[in-house]
Amino acid sequence: MVKIRLNRMGRRHQPFYRIVIVDSRNKRSGKYIESIGYYDPLNNSNQYKVDEDKALDWLLKGAQPTDTARRILRKMGVMKRYDEIKFQARKEKGVKESNEIVEPEGEEVKE
């Protein structure tokens, strides 16, 4: 399973995180597929930056964000766009299914 999670960087007592796409079986700071942003918790404004298009693309491919990554993506507005796209897809799928004509099974009744 592919995850969106934080990869710890920086020195001791001064953490800095990259937001990365990684196979869930890899180590916390192991090899990652792609880096899509960063998060600096020590900055007074909790500075973060995410490439929204890449994050949305990976979410649509099925990547699962961790809790902290999901919180950052929600602040950036990525999760809202993702939810809207998924809702629209479900809505269109429901319309297609309701437009199909279902013929009743069984024999016709003759009078």
From Swiss-Prot:
* Protein name per the record: Small ribosomal subunit protein bS16
Biased composition annotated in UniProt, kind: Acidic residues: 100-111
Q: Which UniProt keywords apply?
A: Ribonucleoprotein, Ribosomal protein
Q: Which GO terms describe its molecular function?
A: structural constituent of ribosome
Keyword Ribosomal protein in annotation: yes
* Source species of the chain: Petrotoga mobilis (strain DSM 10674 / SJ95)
The record, for HAMAP family, names:
Ribosomal_bS16 (MF_00385)
Q: Where is region (Disordered) located? A: 92-111
Q: Where is the signal peptide?
A: none
Family to which the UniProt record says this protein belongs: Belongs to the bacterial ribosomal protein bS16 family.
Pfam families in the record, alphabetically?
Ribosomal_S16 (PF00886)
